[in-house]
Amino acid sequence: MRRYLINTVVAVAAMIILSKAAKRELIVKNNICMAGAASALAVGSFIFDKYTMVLWSVLVMQSYTDITEQHLYLMLPRLLAVMEVAYCLVHRTYLDIPLSVMIFPAVLIAAAMLIRAYTIGDMELLLIIMLHTYNQGISPNEYMVSYLSVTGMVFAVYMIVKNVIGMIKHLVPVWKGAFAPAMTVTYFVMFLWKYLS
């Protein structure tokens, strides 16, 4: 019961942040995306634990701004990164899994950013997901490789659908798009996969 209460508070806080920012015109208001964010936060509040719910809220908020503005705000991910490192130190998760298992995924993410596969905001979200999986007792090596692979496929499907809709509306095809929603969908799918298996 307490978990659901904390998760609901986190979800409501995330929606208040989004709606206040949209009301003050700090971010673009999009009713469809706002409804999608509210739905994602509501579903997340029932299935995630309280630590994962904080990450989920940040992913949903970043997805909203990435779709509506093609921009990621870095304050929340950086704050979450500090929280993940503090969690690692306080709960001593580094004793369960050696820190060296984070070298390969970090190098993989940095290399992908250098070849401009990701923006700096996407890279920070990926690093937070890597830290979170490490703190949950999951080795980031295998998880991040499969996560990046599935995210790439989800993003490709998203871009195909976006361009097909654009062709129907007689718009010019686009080659860049919002990557944070693909990361959010992939995180949800991989969580369900792990939860159901």
Residues covered by each model-derived region:
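A membrane-topology feature that recognizes alpha-helical transmembrane segments
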Residues: 1-197
